[in-house]
Amino acid sequence: MASYHIETYGCTANRGESREIERRLRDAGHHRVPGPESADVAILNTCTVVETTERRMLRRARELERETADLVVTGCMALAQGDAFREAGVDARVCGWDEVPAAVGNGECPTTTPDTEPVLDGVVGILPIARGCMSDCSYCITKHATGKIDSPPIAENVRKAEALVHAGARELRITGQDTGVYGWEQGERKLAELLDRVCAIPGDFRVRVGMANPKGVHGIRDELAEVFAANEELYDFLHAPVQSGSDAVLGDMRRQHNVDEFREVVDAFDERLDGWTLATDFIVGFPTETEADHEASMALLGEVRPEKVNVTRFSKRPGTDAADMKGLGGTVKKERSRAMTDLKMAIMDEVYGDMVGERREVLVVEPGTGDSVKCRDGAYRQIVVRGAGERGIAPGDFLDVEVTSHETVYAFGEPV
């Protein structure tokens, strides 16, 4: 049997896939070691969303190659840009994640199709409801790795969710490249029905819905918002990445939604949910983005005031149409990124500041630093409780807390 070391980069789906790799390796008798230098094989689960990440993956692969006897590379970069490792002189076996356990066992990467297995990580159950997406964004390399959407039946996903709850999951994380288009390849829009049925599973748990593009959510916005309002199991949290406040830029990105449609999604949730959390993403410095386009994005950010915002500077990804566009200068992108980041931080600071003095029920999700634990309230805002060990507080517990203070992106709470 082999010893292994595994490192994971990227999204929740990647982390879930790494947990499943580890489970299968343990079942096969392999054991994990703390560092690559003592491992028979190192496993690198990669991300490739932007150019800086790609460079980081190649650099880390070279380091691991020197530190361990054998290297297996998996994840999105392995699937979308597998040749990049060979071209960089990295001696590694490149596999889909579902192929890694066999590669560790017999030294070969078989050809299989990755599945969507659920994974339990502490009290968090990670449930990929589909793989792939329906979009064709001009800048995105991830689809080269994940392909077109493939949605398992609702009943199958509900069975997986039930298994996670029965195994001890207190938080279910519904994941996918785009959860909003679940079922679209079958001519149906199934996300709302799936969530309703998952919430009907007996047990005391919470459900977080992963990224759902405005394109998919817009057509079911009222139905989806009603499901959120009707089910207390659902965190009042929606991650809908708008990417730009300019319709012209959205068209060049091939995002398949416009700014008003994004606003209509936000309005539908505003009408039905008090104090819900909107998360979104913006790409700054897209090749065709003018100063006016950037100002439109800033205005939209200030208008909808999302509590979580991912701001990413555009970077060219190989094999995408946007890679052939004449880009903006690095200084321009940096200035626009800084301006948007400053605004988002001001919004978040205000949100968490307004929570001070309020009482909220939270779910303890995972250990924090020292003797603290990380908790989530009903809108998925993070509240840290200190001194958890001496109070007998552990992941999986539900607590009533009073918010006592805050940092920019989280609050502190005391049990009451």
Model-derived segments and spans:
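Conserved N-terminal phosphate-binding loop of PLP-dependent enzymes in the Aspartate aminotransferase
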Residues: 203, 221-222, 229, 305-306, ...
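Short flexible coil/turn linkers enriched for glycine and charged/polar residues
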Residues: 120-123, 133-135, 234, 244, ...
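Proteins enriched for Cys/Gly/acidic motifs involved in redox and nucleic-acid/cofactor modification
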Residues: 1-182, 190, 234, 259-271, ...
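Terminal RNA-binding accessory module
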Residues: 316, 324-416
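Glycine-centered loop/turn positions within well-structured domains
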Residues: 135, 147, 180, 247-248, ...
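Short, glycine- and charge-enriched coil/turn segments that flank and shape catalytic ligand pockets
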Residues: 29-31, 35-37, 184-193, 369-371, ...
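Residue-level signature of catalytic and energy-coupling elements of molecular machines
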Residues: 11, 43, 76, 129, ...
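Conserved SAM/AdoMet-binding glycine-rich loop
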Residues: 71, 75, 80-81, 166-291
